[in-house]
Amino acid sequence: MLEDEYQLDFFKNNGFVRKQCQKCGKFFWTRDPERNTCGDAPCDPYSFIGSPVFSREFNISEMREYYLSFFEARGHTRLDRYPVVARWRDDIYLTIASIADFQPFVTSGQVPPPANPLTISQPCIRLNDLDSVGRSGRHLTNFEMMAHHAFNKRGNEIYWKEHTLELCDELLTSLKVDPFAVTYKEEPWAGGGNAGPCVEVIVHGLELATLVFMDLKTDKKGDILIKGETYSKMDNYIVDTGYGLERFVWASKGSPTIYDALFPGIVNELMGLAGLEHELNNTEYSNILAQNARLAGFMDVSEKANLLELRKKVASSIGMTVDKLSVIMEPVEKVYAITDHTRCLTFMLGDGIIPSNVKAGYLARLVLRRTLRMMKDLDIRTPLSEIVDMHIRNMPEYPEFRANFPVIQDILESEEEKFNITMERGRRIIQKSASHFKKTGEKIPLSQLTELYDSHGIPPEMAKEVAADIGVGVEFPDNFYSIIGELHNKAEEKEEEVIPFAERLKHLPKTKRRFYDEPTRLEFEAVVLDVFDNHIVLDNTFFYAEGGGQPADIGTISVGDIVYKVVDVQVYEGVIVHTVDIPDGELEITKGDIITGKVDERRRMTLARHHTATHIVNDAARKVLGKHIWQAGAQKFEDHSRLDLSHYKHISPEELKQIELLANRTVMENKRVITEWMPRIEAEQVYGFGLYQGGVPPGEKIRIVKVGDDVEACGGTHCLSTGVIGPIKILKTERIQDGVERVEFAAGIAAVRAMQKMESLLVDSAKTLSVPPEHLPVSVERFFGEWKDLKKENERLKEDLARSRVYRMLGDASELAGLRVVSEQVPGADSLELQKIATELLKQENVVTLLASDLEGVKLVASVGEKAIECGINAGNLVREMSKIVGGGGGGKPALAMGGGTDPTRIQDALSRGLELVKEACKEA
C-alpha cells in the first residue's frame, strides 16, 4: 500500500534498481544489478566477519563521536542522552528508541522539539529478543541508537525522505563502504500509535540503520492498513532514523560476534571464569566458532522459530552434528548473554531502576535473574557487581554510573541473596506442583510455568530439572523470556475515563484557576456558568480541585444571604465542578448569578503544609538514601501524609532520623517556595526528568515548583516559604510491596499533635510501670527479661504437668487387643498442651490417645503408636470423624492429628466415637 512512497529521485538518480528478494519476498533497492537477495540475515550470511566494512576500526566512543560530529557539521543540534527509564512517559517503562524521547508531546505537535533538526545517541533497552541474545551474534538487550530527527509540518518542512537518504549514503561513503554492498530494504514501520514507510540499510548481511518516515497516526476510520492496523495522515511528519552504534563498531572490526567487538576484555574474563579458555585456544573450536558466527544470523529465536531447528541449519552448514555444535556453542553463548545483560543492568540500575515485581523494576529483575541463572549454569561465582564494575570502567563517558556504583553494588548483592532464597523455596514449590500434575498424567503447562515465574521468580529451566526428578515433563518455548518481557514492557492501558455529565460540560470554557496567581487569597467573586443537581460551574475559582494526591478544598459559595457548603471540587478536561451540600433539597443559584466563594483557610493551609513537606521529605530521602529514590506515589491528608519511595531495602531507623533532620533543617532555613510556568522542553533541559516525580502533566507549559533543592512539575497548593510548614515528624515506615517503602509523616500542627500523642503514650506507659519516662527503656528491658524467664518457667511447669498427666493417663488406660487406649477430656487445655501430651504418649508403641478440651469451642488431638498403626488405626481418620460430631473438621498424619469444632456439649460423644473406631479396627486386624 506504500509502494509509491519509495519511488524517490535519490534512487533514480544514483543508479539504484528495485528488486524483490528471492528468499523473503521483500522489495529492496541496490546499485548491484546482479543482486537477487535483500542482503539481510538470514537471506544472506554475515560476509563482513573477518572482512571489515569500513576503512578503519572504531571503538564505541570513537564511532559515537564520528556520527554526532558528522550530523552537527550538516546543521543538526547535538542533544545529550535521555535516561533508559522513560520517566516522561506513562505508557512505556523503558526507552526503546530515540524517538521515544520525543513522544508523545513533540511527535503529536503539542510541544516544539528541543532542536530541529537534531542528532542524538540514545541508550535504549528492548527485551523482545531476549532469547536471541548471545545466540544470533548480533542481538543486544541494551544498545545505543544513533539518530538524526527532523520534525516537519505542512508548509514548514525541514527535510524529508530524499535528504534523509542522501545523508545516510553520504555517511556510509565517508566511512569508505562499498556502495554496491549497500541495500535499502522496504519495510513499513509501526509503533507507539504512529506509522510510515521505512527503509532498512543493510551491508554484508548486517542491518546498520533504519530510516523511518513517520507521517501516519492510528485511526479506526483510516484508509491506510499497516500490520493489521488502520492509519490516516498526520498534520506533522517526522524523520525518525536509527543507526545502531554497536553494529557500526562491529562492522568496523569484522569480529566473530558483536560481543567480541564491543567487550573483548569482559568476554575473555568471563570465558576464563567459566573455564572455557581451552576452547578459545583449540584450533578446531576456533574454526567452528568462526563458521558459526558467519551463520549466526539464522539464530533469531522467536515464536515461529524453534531453537533446535535453527541449530540444525547451522550444524548442517558447518558439517557437524547438532549435538556436538550445541555442546560447543551453548556455554559460549551464555558468556555472550551474560556480558550483554550485565551492561543492560549497568544502565538500568545506573539510571535509577529498582528491581521489584512491578513495572520497570520487574524488567530489571527479569534480566538480573536470567543473568544469575546462566552464571550458575557456568559455575561463575564472581559477584555480579564485579562484572558491572568492568562495564563501568569501560564507559568513562558515563561518570554518573561510577558515582552511583555503591548503590548499584548494594542492590546487586541484595538481589543475589533474594535469588538464592527464591531457588531454595522454588524447589519445594515445583515439587508440589509437579506432584499434582503427576497424578493427572499431564505435563506442567506453559500457563503454570509463567505463573511460577511471575509470582515466585522460578525460572522454567529449574522447573524442568526438579519436575524431571519426579517424573513429570516440562516444555516451554525457546523464546520464553522474550514472551515474559513483552508481557511486562508496557504500562497497563488506562481505561478511558467516563466523564460525568460530559455532554453538559463540553460546551463550557475551561475554568480560570486563580489560586495559582493569588495563592493567599481565599475569598472571591465569580459568575455562574452552569448549575445542575448540586453542582456549580464558575468562570473562575480559588477552590483547588482534587488532584496529584491532594484532596479538594472545601468552603462555601453564597448568593446574598443564602450560603451553601462546598463539599467537593473536581476537574473534568479543564472545567472545574463545585459540589455543594443542599440541606433543603433545592439549589437557589441560577446561571448568570454572581456568587461569593470562601475557601476554608484551615484545611487549605493544612494540606498546603503537607504538600510542601512531601517535596522536602522526598528530597531529604534522596540525599540520605541515594539518587535512585523516586516517588512511587503520594497522598496528603489533614492529619498526615504518606510518600511511597522506590528503594531496594527497608529504611533503617538511623536513616529515618537523618531524613527527618534534613527535612526540618530545610524548614528552619525558611527558603522561599518558587513557582513558575515554563515550556516543557526548556524545563526538562534545565531540571531533568526528576521533574516528573509526581507524574507527567499534559500541555506545552508545565508548572514548576521549587522547594529547597527539590524541583518538580506540580499543580498542588504550597506554602510561600518552607518556614510556614512548621515541624515535620516522621510517624512510621513500612514496605508496601517489593521495592517500595512507604513513609508516613505529619507537618505543622498535625506534627505537634502527633508528637503530643507519642509523648502521652510514653507518660502513660511510664505510669503503668511506676517509673519516670526517661527510665522507660531500661525498665521495659528489665520487665521483658523477667517475662521471658517466667514464660520459660511456665513452659517447664507445663511440660512437668504434661508428664505427670501422661503417667496418670497410662495408669488409667483401657486394654484392647494388646493395645492401651487413653481417652480423656483435659479441661482448660489449649491445642499445644494437648499436642504435648499426645506426643509424649506417642513414645509408647502400643498406645492410642484420644484427647479433647472445651477451651474456645472444642479442641481434639489423637496420636497412634507404631504397633497401633500396624493394626490399621489412623490418627487422621479418628480426628476427622470425631470433629464431625462437635460440628467441625480436622485431620493429619497417621501418627498425629488435630481438629476441633464448636459444640462442647458433645465432647464425650466425640470421644466415644473415637473409641468405637479403635475397637472396629482391632476386630478387623
Swiss-Prot record:
EC number(s) on file: 6.1.1.7
Cell location: Cytoplasm
Positions annotated to bind Zn(2+): 611, 615, 714, 718
Catalytic activity: tRNA(Ala) + L-alanine + ATP = L-alanyl-tRNA(Ala) + AMP + diphosphate
InterPro entries: aa-tRNA-synth_II/BPL/LPL, Ala-tRNA-lgiase_IIc, Ala-tRNA-ligase_IIc_anticod-bd, Ala-tRNA-synth_IIc_core, Ala-tRNA-synth_IIc_N, Ala-tRNA_lgiase_arc, Ala-tRNA_ligase, DHHA1_dom
GO CC term, one of those recorded: cytoplasm
Lineage top rank: taxon: Archaea
Pfam families noted in UniProt: DHHA1, tRNA-synt_2c, tRNA_SAD
Note on how the cofactor is bound: Binds 1 zinc ion per subunit.
Names of required cofactors: Zn(2+)
Record keywords, A-Z: Aminoacyl-tRNA synthetase, ATP-binding, Cytoplasm, Ligase, Metal-binding, Nucleotide-binding, Protein biosynthesis, RNA-binding, tRNA-binding, Zinc
GO process annotations (BP): alanyl-tRNA aminoacylation
GO molecular function, one term: zinc ion binding
Keyword RNA-binding applies: yes
Gene3D superfamilies (alphabetical): 2.40.30.130, 3.10.310.40, 3.30.54.20, 6.10.250.550, Bira Bifunctional Protein, Domain 2, Threonyl-trna Synthetase, Chain A, domain 2
Family label: Belongs to the class-II aminoacyl-tRNA synthetase family.
NCBIfam families in alphabetical order: A-tRNA_syn_arch, alaS
Record note on domains: Consists of three domains; the N-terminal catalytic domain, the editing domain and the C-terminal C-Ala domain. The editing domain removes incorrectly charged amino acids, while the C-Ala domain, along with tRNA(Ala), serves as a bridge to cooperatively bring together the editing and aminoacylation centers thus stimulating deacylation of misacylated tRNAs.
Function text: Catalyzes the attachment of alanine to tRNA(Ala) in a two-step reaction: alanine is first activated by ATP to form Ala-AMP and then transferred to the acceptor end of tRNA(Ala). Also edits incorrectly charged Ser-tRNA(Ala) and Gly-tRNA(Ala) via its editing domain.
Protein name from the UniProt record: Alanine--tRNA ligase
Naturally occurring in which organism (per UniProt): Methanosarcina acetivorans (strain ATCC 35395 / DSM 2834 / JCM 12185 / C2A)
Lineage: Archaea, Methanobacteriati, Methanobacteriota, Stenosarchaea group, Methanomicrobia
